[in-house]
Amino acid sequence: MHRQSVVRLSRQLGAFPLVELPPPYLAPSLHFPLNRSSVQTSNFSSTAPAAGHGKDLNKSRAVSAIHRTGPRFKLGASKYPLPKPVSPEKLEKRESTPDHGLWGFFPKDRSALSTPEYDNAHGRSWSIQELREKSWEDLHSLWWVCLKEKNRIATSNLERKRLKAGYGEWEANQRLRTIRVTQLNIKHVLRERWYAWEDAQNLYKKGYRPQNEDTEESA
């Protein structure tokens, strides 16, 4: 049966009972709803098509401190006066501080890059026996001298890498190795003193007194 005739009969007779309908595989059009809903379905996006054509009243739109994004339109800088550049000849000459602490990151001649002769002019590292005779203040001062020298070598290596000088790297590494051996020996001596102090503390807790041995020897 043609679909138009089915629609005409359904309007005249109302609706077909489900009992009088043939099976769906014989007449599938009879089992579909004939009266479709007049409700309009929305698209995938519920935003109006003309929403982006109007003026954006949100001043903070697209402003993100994380992504460093600014507003969607250019802003004028006429509200704040811009500083005018000053000629270098009119600037006051500032004298550098001769004893500034940052000069410790550079060689004695205050050059940006140390020469291989300067890095190669060093002695041997401090031995453990020599460091055992030093006081705590001497070890502390020597440690900071080594640390300061390591920072100076790191500054020269960074400048050498930036300039692509191609020389002085081997001499700087040899000097750095000597400094590291000295620092390892300082740690070894301090570790020995810590263990000695810990053993003396344990003996004192057990009742050991050095003056008792002196009394027994004199008797």
From Swiss-Prot:
GO terms for cellular component: mitochondrial large ribosomal subunit. GO terms for biological process: mitochondrial translation. Disulfide bonds: none annotated. Transmembrane segments: none annotated. InterPro entries: MRP-L47_sf (IPR038340), Ribosomal_uL29_mit (IPR010729). Pfam families: MRP-L47 (PF06984). It comes from the Eukaryota. Component of the mitochondrial large ribosomal subunit. Mature mitochondrial ribosomes consist of a small (37S) and a large (54S) subunit. The 37S subunit contains at least 33 different proteins and 1 molecule of RNA (15S). The 54S subunit contains at least 45 different proteins and 1 molecule of RNA (21S). This is Large ribosomal subunit protein uL29m. The gene is mrpl4.
